[in-house]
């Protein structure tokens, strides 16, 4: 993809059988624009979309390969010299443009760790057993930055290779997944390249508020039925949120 702008946010929005990720991407883009009206935002999707919240809507450059296996295409698809890729099912609960200053001297930054809605580091390892069992860095691809560079090209080439040759790579892991998640693939790529080359220290770099049951924690999967949430500002159980909130319940809408 030709470079059209220096910086911008790229939101992959490839629907699954059960999730309308383009709807999620629209909600995320609107939340970013609330704080940064002039931000450049691109959706990456196989669907038609004319929503003006996006500056560009572009297709997958190599076609729909199915689910997570599309992820490596973000490097080829981005129209930016510096890109922040964001998972679609999140909300920007506050300004995030300071990330550019934080990231700009690095070639690749994948976020480390997660927080609960009280802004405490996530302690539960329920969803991260494969990381602990294999000494993988605790990365979350939900926030990933790169600038056009040899390092970024190498990283996403590794991501592609791991997805395409998973039957080989999974033999390197204990208790490997039958189908790899993007976080596991990013973690393997980071470990091969050296985590310090593609991450920032957890206390320095941004990380998501993760609203999964065992992190929050709640009794059920659907936190929206147990916790009280408010808008303007976005608060959960009266606690004001900041940064990016990964709401996880895919059909949740901030503004009803």
Model-derived features with residue positions:
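GT-A fold catalytic core of metal-dependent nucleotide-sugar glycosyltransferases
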Residues: 49, 59, 69-121
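Catalytic phosphate/metal-binding cores of nucleic-acid and nucleotide-processing enzymes, i.e., regions
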Residues: 15-18, 23-24, 43, 77, ...
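A structural signal for short, well-ordered beta-strand segments and their strand-loop junctions
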Residues: 42-45, 84-87, 92, 108-111, ...
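A short acidic, often aromatic-flanked loop/helix-cap motif at beta-alpha or helix-coil junctions
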Residues: 49-51, 63-67, 116-118, 204-210
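Short acidic (Asp/Glu) patches
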Residues: 65-72, 120-132
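Short coil/turn segments at beta-strand junctions that form active-site/ligand-binding loops
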Residues: 5, 39, 80-82, 106, ...
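Glycine/proline-rich, flexible active-site/cofactor-binding loop segments
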Residues: 8-73, 227, 247, 251, ...
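A glycosyltransferase accessory/donor-loop signature
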Residues: 1-7, 11, 43, 53-56, ...
